[in-house]
Amino acid sequence: ASVNTKKEYDEVTAINKKIRSVLKNFKKNAYVGFTATPFANIFIDPMLAENSEDRDLYPSDFIISLVSPDNYFGPQKIFGPENAEESEYIRLLAEENTGEAKEDWQKYFPVKQKKDVTCHKVDDLPRTLKEAINLFIFNIYVRNHRGYASKHNSMLIHVSCLVDMHDAIKKQVTRYLLDLADNIRNYAGMKGTSEYLKYITPLENLFKEMLKNNWASSPEFEAPDFDKMLSELPNIISSITVGMSNTSEATIKYSSEHQTNMIAIGGNSLARGFTIENLSVSYFLRNTKMCDTLLQ
């Protein structure tokens, strides 16, 4: 927020201007800025103004790249090195051109969205989003059995900046969770039937696929068992809260007394500058030309 984003050098953004005015009150001062997305910062020319009092805040002296701590889960960990073929943490929703996956989500969440046209299309959820929700539910089970039953769990859904879209998605996610819990209660014990094949087998297939990809693998714990997990899923699903964060509603709140399992839906306010507790699954379809926004 302290970066002066005005195009003309003699124009200054509000926060940048106020920080400069504070520094002018002292004969000796130093301004140190920290950023996780150092894109615009490195192109600032601190000597652009003729008057030293009007010079920008940084980086007139130096820029230092801090060493990441061992427990930092950042872009290099998520995406891997540049020559990596794929990341174990990312499942692409679509390739560059065409494919089943792209058609899956684009029917509901097109890249270009207009409020009056798009919102009425959200009468269901794409298969990929349902799978992401299922994986989040699996994660809660695994964490509960690893001693984190009192810790929060979160999932992020960011597919639109339209408030009306957030509301439509929230309704469909809530409906999906209710239906999923009912289907597990009704059909989990009916192996070999068409109902089991329709409602339970997709969960089992996802579970097996994730195990093959080293999901929930740890030398300290046994691999989870699907049937044991299945019996606990209805209670886990009923514990999940679907919240939103946007200009009209802010219902993403975590309890200070017990575990909160949160599916957070939002747009710009949720994409950057918002702390989500123990985030384990993100369903992300953001389209932006700004490098820092994309990285955030």
What function would you assign to each model-found segment?
Residues 18-22, 28-29, 51-54, 142-146, ...:
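Generic recognition of flexible, low-complexity loop/linker segments
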Residues 262-265, 270-287:
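A short beta-strand element within the Helicase C-terminal
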Residues 2-4, 38-43, 49-50, 72-75, ...:
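Flexible loop/turn segments at secondary-structure boundaries
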Residues 1, 33-34, 262, 267-269, ...:
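Subunit-assembly interface segments of extracellular/virion macromolecular structures
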Residues 55-64, 174-183, 280-296:
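C-terminal, active-site-flanking charged/polar segments
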Residues 2-142, 154, 188-197:
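Conserved P-loop NTPase catalytic core
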Residues 1-10, 128, 142-263:
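Conserved C-terminal RecA-like helicase domain
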Residues 22-29, 147, 179-184, 276, ...:
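Secondary-structure transition/capping motifs at alpha-helix termini
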